[in-house]
Amino acid sequence: MDPIADYLTKIRNAIKAKHRVVEVPASNIKKEITKVLFDKGYIQSYKFEESAVQGSIKIALKYHPLTKESAIVKIERISKPGLRKYTHAETMPRVLNGLGVAIVSTSKGIMSDKEAKNLNIGGEVLCFVY
């Protein structure tokens, strides 16, 4: 199974169940995606827990204090192992007319679409978040 799709599905399921915290197995790519989600304000906090085997990431999800709606409305995988999606800096996709974020894997690491566009580098579009 695709580990990134599994990571996104665990977050999606935790949001649907209104969980405050979700724990996912750690990997370097998941850590970088988590950092981008935190920097863009989609999650409240995160903590990397190292263990003997793999470690885990505890993610505190962000909800609106009054309406209890999640900051993440939709999170979807774009580039899949069977069909990779690559883009140039000029053709970087706009998510929800700029209101959402595309997370991109570039030669300089994993970053948001806006950061990649500013650095004028393209890469593999991992997922959309809005």
Curated annotation (Swiss-Prot):
Fetch the InterPro entries from UniProt. Answer: Ribosomal_uS8 (IPR000630), Ribosomal_uS8_CS (IPR047863), Ribosomal_uS8_sf (IPR035987)
Q: Which Gene Ontology cellular-component terms appear in the entry?
A: ribonucleoprotein complex; ribosome
UniProt-listed GO biological process terms: translation
Name any one Pfam family assigned in the record: Ribosomal_S8
Record key words, sorted: Ribonucleoprotein, Ribosomal protein, RNA-binding, rRNA-binding
Homology family: Belongs to the universal ribosomal protein uS8 family.
Explain the purpose of this protein.
Answer: One of the primary rRNA binding proteins, it binds directly to 16S rRNA central domain where it helps coordinate assembly of the platform of the 30S subunit.
What NCBIfam families does the database record attribute to this sequence?
A: PRK00136.1 (NF001109)
Quaternary form? Part of the 30S ribosomal subunit. Contacts proteins S5 and S12.
- What's the protein called, per UniProt? Small ribosomal subunit protein uS8
Q: Which gene encodes it?
A: rpsH
